[in-house]
């Protein structure tokens, strides 16, 4: 798998969480480990041993039991969990936590109600690597996403929609943040 120093863990039902961190993981060449509910496989533990480990998603997707397991193998013996109340809030927290000022933003469907609709976000991960995060939205952006973008987006930032299904209101709200 090559050399890497970071890993990210998401829950088995945390597809949107995985898409939120996909661009950063691709940039860092870091694997995204999808865990089972109660424990991690021996292979996953071996792969992550001594690495910097980040959890993306709440305890409904990655249990505190797994978080404790991860702390035992993390390089610094501490694991950072990035979570929000919803997939959109977690997406905003990923942007706030893992990105500085942004000159590029990618937008893809959020998959809400149908995780199969996250296919555009999946395709965007390698494209966005090292350039900017993926904002997950469909009909609107949440207050947490708006706040994160207001803090992070540089005026004049380039915004790219990946695929169809993101409503014009999302683009209009981002344009307003950018002063367009």
Predicted regions and their residues:
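Extracellular glycan-binding segments that recognize GlcNAc-based cell-wall polysaccharides
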Residues: 1-180
């Amino acid at each position: 798998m090559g050399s890497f120093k970071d890993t990210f863990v998401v829950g088995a039902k945390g597809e949107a969480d995985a898409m939120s961190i996909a661009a950063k993981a691709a940039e860092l060449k870091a694997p995204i480990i999808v865990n089972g509910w109660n424990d991690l496989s021996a292979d996953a533990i071996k792969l992550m041993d001594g690495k910097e480990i980040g959890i993306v998603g709440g305890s409904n997707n990655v249990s505190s039991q797994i978080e404790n397991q991860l702390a035992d193998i993390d390089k610094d013996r501490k694991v950072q969990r990035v979570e929000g109340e919803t997939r959109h809030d977690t997406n905003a927290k990923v942007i706030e936590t893992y990105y500085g000022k942004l000159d590029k933003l990618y937008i893809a469907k959020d998959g809400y109600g149908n995780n199969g609709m996250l296919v555009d976000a999946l395709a965007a991960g390698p494209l966005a690597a090292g350039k900017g995060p993926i904002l997950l939205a469909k009909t609107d952006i949440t207050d947490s996403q708006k706040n994160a973008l207001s803090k992070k987006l540089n005026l004049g930032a380039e915004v790219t929609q990946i695929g169809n299904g993101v409503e014009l209101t999302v683009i209009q709200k981002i344009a307003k943040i950018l002063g367009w």
